[in-house]
């Protein structure tokens, strides 16, 4: 596959977040509401689309838990399938809750505390010390921080090879400060004008704006975007349809929630141009 520019996702591509972000989703809902979803269900929300932002995924998981309490007769499979059919994301999750009677809907809304969920999530993920530094206040709970439990997935030799041969950018749903920590951990130096984080755009994946803008900044002709979710591949597909002046490739990486042959099939169905076992295989795939 020929490309002159490579754009990388962070979570599930450069660092393993199964024990950090995904754990924080599950435990935030548990701490706020006393029950939660199973961690494998997070991938079902991701596959439904529109959940690049893990705070919003946490909000949607909480909605599911609260709606079930109020009589919503759906399991997580049915709930996420319906979310997907409605276009994905938090707005779709809220629409599913609209199946409840009005009084039950009102009770769900009254109990749904997005601020408490976000503060709990950040305290669990960052830990008390980083929470005080980055959030500017006292954490609601004392924790060591799951951010310290993120094994790297990319070899130093891969970073050296890819940055020597390609213009390299980053497109991630992380806040900028948390992206800095992950990029420093893997040894990837990406200037601010060559990356998009949660702080830089509102639309989120799979909207193509950020990827197209990165391509413009690089003056690229052929852009490969590697990510671990279906929305990453959809972002590349949407960019290819939107920007007629360039070619965009979507590459699925099997070190996130999608793995094995089932993961390959899902990526292929989403329009992936290639699927790799891990980010290190990009060295051989790209030329």
What are these regions (language model features)?
Residues 1-50, 56-59, 63-68:
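Active-site neighborhood of HAD-like aspartate-dependent phosphohydrolases
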């Amino acid at each position: 596959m020929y490309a002159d520019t490579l754009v990388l996702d962070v979570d599930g591509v450069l660092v393993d977040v199964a024990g950090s972000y995904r754990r924080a989703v599950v435990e935030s809902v548990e701490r706020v509401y006393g029950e939660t979803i199973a961690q494998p269900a997070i991938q079902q929300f991701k596959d439904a689309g529109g959940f690049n932002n893990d705070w919003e995924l946490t909000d949607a998981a909480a909605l599911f838990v609260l709606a079930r309490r109020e009589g919503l007769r759906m399991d997580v499979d049915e709930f996420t399938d319906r979310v997907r059919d409605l276009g994905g994301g938090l707005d779709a999750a809220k629409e599913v809750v609209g199946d409840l009677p009005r009084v039950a809907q009102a009770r769900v809304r009254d109990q749904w505390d997005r601020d408490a969920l976000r503060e709990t999530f950040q305290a669990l993920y960052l830990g008390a010390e980083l929470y005080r530094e980055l959030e500017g206040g006292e954490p609601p709970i004392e924790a060591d921080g799951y951010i310290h439990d993120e094994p790297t997935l990319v070899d130093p030799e891969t970073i050296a090879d890819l940055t020597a041969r390609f213009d390299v950018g980053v497109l991630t749903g992380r806040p900028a400060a948390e992206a800095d920590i992950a990029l420093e951990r893997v040894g990837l130096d990406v200037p601010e004008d060559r990356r998009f984080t949660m702080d830089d755009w509102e639309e989120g994946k799979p909207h193509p704006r950020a990827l197209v803008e990165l391509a413009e900044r690089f003056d690229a002709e052929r852009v490969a975007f590697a990510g671990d979710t279906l929305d990453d591949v959809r972002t590349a597909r949407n960019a290819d349809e939107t920007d007629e002046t360039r070619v965009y490739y979507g590459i699925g990486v099997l070190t996130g929630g999608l793995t094995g042959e089932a993961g390959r099939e899902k990526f292929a169905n989403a329009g992936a141009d290639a699927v790799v076992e891990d980010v290190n295989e990009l060295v051989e795939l790209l030329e």
